[in-house]
């Protein structure tokens, strides 16, 4: 044991010595340095080489002296360091004077020509600022690369995560310690603008004239300042308002796999809530498609939510899309949250925060964790998964000053809700809306699963007794229908009792009535969007449960708004069916054309089918008694169909 410890200690000392040696060999661009022992240049061999060597001897000596130099660290102040190592999105920085930045502090990497950074250097050397840069006086366009400190490795080296691509970054680049976390612009100047993780505008409309900037790392509100709300946020979407209502000032999660409609649903919520919402909204695109962010921006401009000229914009956009490095995708959520917190705390607003997609936040954290060398936990996620999620989610809260209502899209890998990423998110949410691939395959949109979706607001003391009873009855009848599906698939509808048949018919109508056309999907469906009030939804579903609409065809309940739309669609369906059925004509023996009724047409079809089968049976020698029995069976089976069609036409 003693020998092993001694050997380990020696290895540690050797590695530390190697680190120190490698650090001293890092050249810094822009600093004159003293020469050190350098290897002799190889002797020229051919006559051409000798001639070239003689002509360019002085130039080669000068370049050799500049390249093989040792850093004169006396030229650096205590807030300056140099890039020691670059490994993709991870950058190691050496601070020679021993004053290391804190964890989560922002570092700036640049060539730092005098005309760009005179103010920065002045602030760094100003004792009154205690080493902190006044970010309000640093133009963001001068910042080439921002790093965030993640680890202290020892011997003056810190390991950082880059918030942008590191292409072209080399060892020896000068690094400045800002002395604080990343600061981003906040306030009404951000409304109508698109910015990235470091607060840089990316909409081509010039700099953001913000008067204040705030750090992206902040503590959650104190427990004494919290003021939970118990009021419903009406979305105008039937399945959500009825079965999994959202709370004002709560956290809402939209769970679903790839391609089931999370982004479309979140855009419809923006359309229905943000446009009618009196306060401000913040949309944060985390690791999603740049095309969707571009489309969303132009849709908001057309809708008047964003005004390119003059004041009046209601939403701020923060994007860190899927082409960004993991550092940007992991921190852009905090940037958007910081903007929303300012509106809540400083201006007392009720803010809407949309995040698409919160899974990409977790995924970026997993990538960063692997790059930093941490041992992964279950399914390859970072060991700090719960901590990272909690630090972000706890800042989304309702206080005595204002509220933040967040709607978060959550991608579910392989449609597995037990995956650690969505499972960790579940614990922080007030309402969960689960999008089902099985329902989307039926063509029902939004494909919200009414049995898996939940809400803490489903309490009769909050939503009212009538709403609670109708919602639970709807879920009950859908659950009964789900349990009967296996029996129907094996034995068919004939083996069900009359009550079970009524349950199936009403459940299928409810299932289709939960679909709804969206305004944001008008270009794809060619159907006008519908906003349905909660009171109308309760009344309509109550009527379906009581059997008031049993006479309406099932197809009339598909992709409509309120129950009035169902009745209008049913009338159109019956009218078109009547034209096809009633206007079918036959020619009598006298040559006159007469109108054929529904019963006559069905009877004619029965006769045709019967005669075709009788012809076959006679060929095989069937008895007359057997043929009469067959006739009675045909008439019995079609009698119910004839009666139903006649009732529909009379309506």
UniProtKB/Swiss-Prot annotation:
Alphabetized Gene3D superfamilies for the sequence: 2.40.10.170, Bovine Mitochondrial F1-atpase, Atp Synthase Beta Chain, Chain D, domain 3, P-loop containing nucleotide triphosphate hydrolases
Residues engaged in binding Mg(2+) 1: 263
Record's bilayer topology term: Peripheral membrane protein
A GO CC annotation given for this chain: proton-transporting ATP synthase complex
HAMAP family: ATP_synth_beta_bact
Subunit structure: Homotrimer. Component of the ATP synthase complex composed at least of ATP5F1A/subunit alpha, ATP5F1B/subunit beta, ATP5MC1/subunit c (homooctomer), MT-ATP6/subunit a, MT-ATP8/subunit 8, ATP5ME/subunit e, ATP5MF/subunit f, ATP5MG/subunit g, ATP5MK/subunit k, ATP5MJ/subunit j, ATP5F1C/subunit gamma, ATP5F1D/subunit delta, ATP5F1E/subunit epsilon, ATP5PF/subunit F6, ATP5PB/subunit b, ATP5PD/subunit d, ATP5PO/subunit OSCP.
Protein name: ATP synthase F(1) complex catalytic subunit beta, mitochondrial
Organism of provenance: Dictyostelium discoideum (Social amoeba)
């Amino acid at each position: 044991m003693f020998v092993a410890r001694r050997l380990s200690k020696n290895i540690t000392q050797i590695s530390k010595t190697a680190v120190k040696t490698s650090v001293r060999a890092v050249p810094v661009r822009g600093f004159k340095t003293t020469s050190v022992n350098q290897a002799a240049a190889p002797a020229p061999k051919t006559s051409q080489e000798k001639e070239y060597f003689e002509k360019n001897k002085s130039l080669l000596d000068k370049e050799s002296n500049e390249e093989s130099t040792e850093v004169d660290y006396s030229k650096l102040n205590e807030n300056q360091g140099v890039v020691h190592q670059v490994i993709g999105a991870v950058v190691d920085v050496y601070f020679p004077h021993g004053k290391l930045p804190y964890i989560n502090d922002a570092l700036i990497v640049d060539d730092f020509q005098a005309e760009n950074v005179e103010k920065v250097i002045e602030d760094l050397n100003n004792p009154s600022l205690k080493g902190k840069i006044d970010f309000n006086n640093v133009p963001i366009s001068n910042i080439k690369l921002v790093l965030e400190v993640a680890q202290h490795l020892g011997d003056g080296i810190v390991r950082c995560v880059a918030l942008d691509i590191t292409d072209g970054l080399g060892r020896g680049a000068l690094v400045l310690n800002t002395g604080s976390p990343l600061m981003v612009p906040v306030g009404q100047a951000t409304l109508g603008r698109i910015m990235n993780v470091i607060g840089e505008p990316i909409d081509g409309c010039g700099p953001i004239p913000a008067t204040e900037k705030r750090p992206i790392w902040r503590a959650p509100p104190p427990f004494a300042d919290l003021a939970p709300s118990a009021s419903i946020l009406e979305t105008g979407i039937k399945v959500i308002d009825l079965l999994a209502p959202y709370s004002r000032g709560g956290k809402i999660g939209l769970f679903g796999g790839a391609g089931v409609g999370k982004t479309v649903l979140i855009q419809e919520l923006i359309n229905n809530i943000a446009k009618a919402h009196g306060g401000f909204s913040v949309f944060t695109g985390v690791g999603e498609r740049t095309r969707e962010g571009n489309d969303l921006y132009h849709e908001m401009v057309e809708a008047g939510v964003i005004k390119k000229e003059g004041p009046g914009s209601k939403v701020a956009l923060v994007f860190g899309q899927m082409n960004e490095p993991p550092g940007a995708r992991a921190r852009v959520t905090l940037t958007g949250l910081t903007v929303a917190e300012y509106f809540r705390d400083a201006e007392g607003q009720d803010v809407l925060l949309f995040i698409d997609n919160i899974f990409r936040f977790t995924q970026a954290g997993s990538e960063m964790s692997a790059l930093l060398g941490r041992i992964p936990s279950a399914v390859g996620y970072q060991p700090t998964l719960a901590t990272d999620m909690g630090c972000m989610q706890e800042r989304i809260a309702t206080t005595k000053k204002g509220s933040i209502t967040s709607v978060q899209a959550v991608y579910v890998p392989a449609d597995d809700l037990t995956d650690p990423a969505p499972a960790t998110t579940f614990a922080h949410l007030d309402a969960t809306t689960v999008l089902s691939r099985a329902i989307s395959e039926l063509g029902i949109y939004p494909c919200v699963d009414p049995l898996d979706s939940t809400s803490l607001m489903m309490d009769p003391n909050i939503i009212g007794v009538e709403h609670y009873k109708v919602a639970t009855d709807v879920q009950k009848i859908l659950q009964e229908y789900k349990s009967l599906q296996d029996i129907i698939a094996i034995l068919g509808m004939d083996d069900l009792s009359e009550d079970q048949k009524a349950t199936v018919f009403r459940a299928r109508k409810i299932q289709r009535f939960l679909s709804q056309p969206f305004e944001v999907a008008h270009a794809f469906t060619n159907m006008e969007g519908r906003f349905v009030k909660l009171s109308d939804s309760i009344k309509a579903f109550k009527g379906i449960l009581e059997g008031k609409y049993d006479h309406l065809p099932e197809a009339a309940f598909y992709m409509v708004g309120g129950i009035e739309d169902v009745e209008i669609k049913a009338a159109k369906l019956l009218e078109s069916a009547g034209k096809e059925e009633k206007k079918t004509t036959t020619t009598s023996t006298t040559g006159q054309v007469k109108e054929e009724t529904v019963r006559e047409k069905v009877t004619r079809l029965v006769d045709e089918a019967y005669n075709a089968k009788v012809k076959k049976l006679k060929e095989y020698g069937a008895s007359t008694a057997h043929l009469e029995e067959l006739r009675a069976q045909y008439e019995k089976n079609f009698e119910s169909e004839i009666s139903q069609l006649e009732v529909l036409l009379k309506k």
